[in-house]
Amino acid sequence: PAFWYQDDEIAVLASERPVIQTALNVSADRIRELQPGQALLINKAGKLRTVQINKPREVKPCSFERIYFSRGSDMDIYKERKLLGEKLVPNILKAIDKDIDHTVFSFIPNTAEVAFYGMLQGLDDYLNEEKVRQIAALGHNPSHDELERILSRRIRSEKVAIKDIKLRTFIAEGNSRNDLAAHVYDITYGSLVPGTD
């Protein structure tokens, strides 16, 4: 992809929309995407125009490249990553046999974080449906304790995996890169209950 912006003072083209938004402090709706087969031409007088130089082919974006490598601050990428996490919920529930009470949800920093939030929203929706079903099964006059037991259920999430930024910087500068690379990620001790989670 390529994105462009023009005003009275500047014309700019970049591979990612958020770079233009941040550098020039402009909103996303003022930035245009260059379409397949188009070229952005600027003459010596500074007049800008788009020209169709090739016949557009079928667009076949690589979903992995788009979701994983794209800048996460782009509004469309953010929505797609959240939706990806939400769409994982049925498979996750199947994998854990719907045992959310003994499951702690987390993510590997950094790219997966946004998908993680989408997954949590999907899990919250699932749990709310379960709560409604359980309350309805109690009948018309449930006790305070019965309601409290059902309503207190939560999706458990922790920041289990962390990135050791200091070690990552050290590895990038040092000669023992291969030996230390496995330790760039660490766990947050105490975030899980051994034998239970």
Where does each model-flagged region fall?
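N-terminal segments that mediate ammonia production and transfer
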Residues: 1-195
